[in-house]
Amino acid sequence: MKPNVFFENDTVVLRAPRAFTPNVLFESGQCFRFYPKNEEKTRYGGVAHGHYFEVELRGEEILFPNMTEKAFSSTFRDYFDLDFDYDACILSFPKDEYLRSAVRSCGGMRILHQEPFETLCSFILSQNNNIPRIRSLIEALCAAYGEP
């Protein structure tokens, strides 16, 4: 099922959190510019496509506080691949034990549509490194050479 999206007081709200789990997504090593904002790892802040934003899991909802409908629709709906129905995809391979095991351990993962150059740099930096070191290298590059 695709997440149900609605807008409420400068906050984007997604229902269907099973299809989107922030800590699984941001701690997976797929992206390196998001950091937990609380000890429970239910709120993350980070940069994507030149914008800082926060994502919070609250009960049955995923919140994007201080985000306009325009910013969400023009950039972040695609970034988080929200128009793809991951549940339907998962149901299409019920007999593959390897894939079922991956879904059990990484439920809520999405494929991020990241900027190609940042993805390339992240991949190069990831060789023979761990996630904390990759994050610090990417932050150093962004601070030194990124746009203000």
Predicted regions and their residues:
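HhH-family (HhH-GPD) DNA N-glycosylase catalytic core used in base-excision repair
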Residues: 1-148
